[in-house]
UniProtKB/Swiss-Prot annotation:
The keyword Signal applies. The keyword Signal applies. The gene is LCP1. Residues 1-14 form the signal peptide. PANTHER family: ADULT CUTICLE PROTEIN 65AA-RELATED, CUTICLE PROTEIN. Keywords: Cuticle, Signal. PROSITE patterns: CHIT_BIND_RR_1, CHIT_BIND_RR_2. InterPro entries: CHIT_BIND_RR_consensus, Cuticle_Struct_Prot, Insect_cuticle. The lineage of its organism: Eukaryota, Metazoa, Ecdysozoa, Arthropoda, Hexapoda. One of its GO terms (cellular component) is chitin-based extracellular matrix. GO terms for molecular function: structural constituent of chitin-based larval cuticle. This is Larval cuticle protein 1. Residues 34-107 form the Chitin-binding type R&R domain. Component of the cuticle of the larva of Helicoverpa armigera.
Length: 109
């Protein structure tokens, strides 16, 4: 029992110090009754994100109409080497599509 108590004390002492929470500089969200939305935020450590979603009519595999949400947005941060990175993306009935310097480009034939 003493060994268990000593092990717990050792773990508590060896634990890394808790990080301070990052301040939110800006945060907004707006949703419309029909399903469209906008949101964004920015933090004190340089992370930011913004996104919009709009409802549109699309056809499924059987050519039946249905509604989909088309999403467009971007996020930015600083990587471990100190380089700024921004990723722009959109998603619709064809899938998720993203572009940024950290995302590999498909090989061209």
């Amino acid at each position: 029992m003493i060994l268990v108590a000593l092990a717990l004390v050792a773990l508590a002492v060896a634990a890394p110090p808790a990080e301070e929470p990052v301040q939110i500089l800006r945060s907004e969200f707006n949703q419309q009754p029909e399903g469209s939305y906008q949101f964004g935020f920015e933090t004190a450590d340089g992370i930011s994100r913004s996104e919009t979603g709009d409802v549109k009519e699309a056809l499924d595999e059987e050519n039946k109409p249905h509604k989909v949400v088309v999403v467009r947005g971007s996020y930015s941060y600083t990587d471990k080497e100190g380089n700024p990175e921004t990723v722009n993306y959109f998603a619709d009935e064809t899938g998720y599509h993203a572009e940024g310097s950290s995302i590999p480009k498909p090989a061209r034939k």
